[in-house]
A protein has these predicted regions:
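Extreme N-terminal signal-anchor transmembrane helix of membrane signaling/transducer proteins, especially
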Residues: 1-19, 23
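Conserved small/polar residues in nucleotide/adenosyl-binding loops
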Residues: 261-265
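Short regulatory alpha-helical segment in sensory/regulatory domains of signaling proteins that mediates
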Residues: 41, 58-62, 73-81, 163-169, ...
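Extracytoplasmic/periplasmic ligand-binding sensor regions of membrane-associated signaling proteins
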Residues: 79-81, 85, 90-166, 170-173, ...
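Extracellular/periplasmic ligand-binding regions of membrane signal-transduction receptors
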Residues: 34-35, 39-70, 87-98, 202-203
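Intrinsic low-complexity, intrinsically disordered coil/linker regions enriched in small/polar
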Residues: 158-252
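Short amphipathic alpha-helical segments
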Residues: 26, 30, 48, 52, ...
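Sensory beta-strand/linker motifs that couple input domains to effectors
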Residues: 152, 256-258
Length: 271
C-alpha cells in the first residue's frame, strides 16, 4: 500500500508540475510576443523619423530632383544603417543614392507613400543587385502637398537583426510572417528544420499534431483576421512539444511569431 501511495503521489506531482510549467510557459510566451512586437515597431519608427527629417530637408528646395537633393541622398545614406536611399517623384520615377534610376509606380509602397502615408513593403528582390529587401517610405510634403516620396531599404537579414535573439536561451526562435504565413524575417533556427525567407510556415506546421483542441486551420484563420493566439504542437523528433504564440505586428498585416520548446517538469525544477 505504501508503494502504491508513493506511486500515486508521484503521478499527481508530475501532472500538477506539468500544468504549472505549461501555464508559466504560456504566460511567458504572451509576454515575449508583446515585447518582440513593441521592440520592432520602436526600431521601425526610428527609421521613419530619420527619413522624415531628411524629407523635410529635401522639401526646402524649389525642385524635387535637383542636384542638391541628389547630393543630400548620398550624404545622409552614409549616416544611416539603411542600404539605399531613393527619392521618387509623383510619376514614380526613382533616383537612388548610387545614381541608379528606375520607375516604381507599380509598387504598393509608392502608391501608399504618394497618398501621404508611411509605408513598408513586403520583401522584394532588387532588380539592381538581386538582394531581397524591404522598403520603408515617407511622403515629402511641401506646403501640405505631397511632392514625392523618400524611401530607404534594408536587407531582410538586417530586419531579422531587429528581433530579440535572447528570449529563449537557445530553446526557441522568432519569426515575422505575412498573414499568408510567408516568412519575412527570423532570428534563431529550429534544430529540426532550416528556415528560409519566403517559406510558408504552415507547410511545415501542418505535419505536426496540435494539442488541446486547436488546429493549424484555426491558426490560419487567426492570421487572416489579424488575431493573436497560442497553440501547442507535438510530433517532433526529440519527443518534446512546442508552443507557437502569434500576434499582429500592427504593420502591413504582418504577424510576429514565437516558437518555444515546452520544458519538462524536470527542466522546470532545475532552471
Amino acid at each position: 500500500m505504501f508503494i502504491l501511495a508513493v506511486g500515486i503521489g508521484l503521478i499527481f506531482f508530475y501532472v500538477v508540475a506539468q500544468k504549472t510549467i505549461d501555464s508559466s510557459s504560456q504566460e511567458r510566451m504572451k509576454t515575449n510576443v508583446a515585447r518582440q512586437s513593441e521592440h520592432l515597431r520602436t526600431i521601425l519608427n526610428i527609421h521613419y523619423s530619420y527619413l522624415e527629417g531628411v524629407a523635410e530637408k529635401i522639401a526646402e528646395s524649389n525642385e524635387l530632383m535637383n542636384e542638391e537633393n541628389k547630393e543630400v541622398l548620398t550624404v545622409f545614406q552614409k549616416n544611416t544603417s539603411l542600404d539605399r536611399l531613393a527619392l521618387i517623384d509623383p510619376e514614380g520615377n526613382a533616383y537612388y543614392d548610387n545614381g541608379v534610376e528606375k520607375n516604381v509606380s507599380h509598387r504598393r509602397y509608392f502608391k501608399e507613400g504618394i497618398s501621404g502615408n508611411r509605408t513598408l513593403s513586403d520583401p522584394l528582390e532588387s532588380s539592381v543587385d538581386q538582394e531581397t529587401r524591404v522598403v520603408l517610405g515617407v511622403p515629402v510634403f511641401h506646403e501640405d502637398e505631397v511632392i514625392g516620396i523618400l524611401c530607404g531599404s534594408c536587407n531582410v537579414g538586417e530586419l531579422s537583426q531587429m528581433l530579440f535573439d535572447d528570449l529563449f536561451s537557445g530553446n526557441g526562435y522568432s519569426l515575422i510572417v505575412t498573414k499568408e504565413g510567408k516568412i519575412v524575417a527570423h532570428t534563431g533556427e529550429p534544430v529540426d528544420h532550416k528556415l528560409s525567407y519566403g517559406e510558408d510556415i504552415f507547410t511545415f506546421y501542418e505535419s505536426k499534431t496540435t494539442r488541446e483542441g486547436h488546429s493549424i486551420g484555426e491558426v490560419k484563420q487567426n492570421f487572416a483576421m489579424g488575431e493573436e493566439g497560442l497553440v501547442r504542437l507535438a510530433g517532433y523528433a526529440d519527443g518534446s512539444d512546442r508552443y507557437l504564440a502569434y500576434a499582429p505586428l500592427g504593420i502591413n498585416d504582418w504577424m510576429i511569431c514565437l516558437l518555444y520548446t515546452s520544458p519538462s517538469p524536470r527542466d522546470g525544477a532545475t532552471s
